Each structure stands twice: as structure tokens, then as C-alpha cells.
Amino acid sequence: MARIAGVDLPRDKRVEVGLTYIFGIGRKTSNNILAAAGINPDTRIKDLTEEEVNNLRRIIDADHHVEGDLRREIALNIKRLKEIRCYRGIRHIKGLPVRGQKTKTNARTRKGPKKTVGRKKKK
């Protein structure tokens, strides 16, 4: 099993798909990395030589923010928004959608389960 950026890549997957198991690398970035390394995207991870794995490791470490560094950067950005109390920061604090979605009917993922409000019965 190839280990790149602290992630064990699945041996039976194609390299193009296997690299997407690393946080911060999607299909497009994966293809760009493989083009820079000169590796065929259809190759299976188990068929990579040690030299090719080291080359991939070097390219990812040099050119891309991945895994822990990227998670830390995102968390710091959100923390900064909260500290300066801008609109987006306040939405993060309140647990509401940040990117302008409507909240009258949907947004259950951010708001959590519905809290039913009781009503007094008429006599």
C-alpha cells in the first residue's frame, strides 16, 4: 500500500482515483499531478514503482496544501471570520448557512433537527 501525505492509498484503484483519497486533492488536481509526474492515470497503485511513488510524494509536498495543513488553514480562516464578526463569521457562529441560501424552509443540515414549538389549545 502506497503511503502519500500520511494517507494509505488503496492498492487496487487506479492512480487517478487513489490520489483523491488525500484531503485537498480531487480528480482535476489528481490529473494535473499525474501529468507533471508523467504517470499514466490508468495505472493501478499496486503497479507503481517506488521511484514513481517518491516522485508523486515530492510533487504533492512541493506544490499542494493537503491533509493536516489544509484542514488547519481552513479552520484558521473560519476562526478569523468569527473574530472579526463579519456577516460570514456570524453565520458560522449561529450555525446557519454561510453562502446565501434561504433558511425559511430548508437548511436542516446546518440548523439540525426541527424543534417543534408547542401551541396552547383553545377552551
Curated annotation (Swiss-Prot):
Gene Ontology biological process terms in this record: translation
GO cellular component terms attached to this protein's record: cytosol; small ribosomal subunit
Keywords of the record: Ribonucleoprotein, Ribosomal protein, RNA-binding, rRNA-binding, tRNA-binding
SUPFAM superfamilies reported in the protein's UniProt record: S13-like H2TH domain (SSF46946)
Superkingdom, taxonomy of origin: Bacteria
Keyword rRNA-binding found: yes
Residue segments, region Disordered: 97-123
MF-aspect GO terms: rRNA binding; structural constituent of ribosome; tRNA binding
Compositionally biased intervals (Basic residues): 101-123
Similarity-based family: Belongs to the universal ribosomal protein uS13 family.
Alphabetical list of NCBIfam families matching this protein: uS13_bact
Function text: Located at the top of the head of the 30S subunit, it contacts several helices of the 16S rRNA. In the 70S ribosome it contacts the 23S rRNA (bridge B1a) and protein L5 of the 50S subunit (bridge B1b), connecting the 2 subunits; these bridges are implicated in subunit movement. Contacts the tRNAs in the A and P-sites.
Quaternary structure, from the entry: Part of the 30S ribosomal subunit. Forms a loose heterodimer with protein S19. Forms two bridges to the 50S subunit in the 70S ribosome.
Protein name, UniProt field: Small ribosomal subunit protein uS13
Annotated source species: Alkaliphilus oremlandii (strain OhILAs)
Upper classification of the organism: Bacteria, Bacillati, Bacillota, Clostridia, Peptostreptococcales
Gene: rpsM
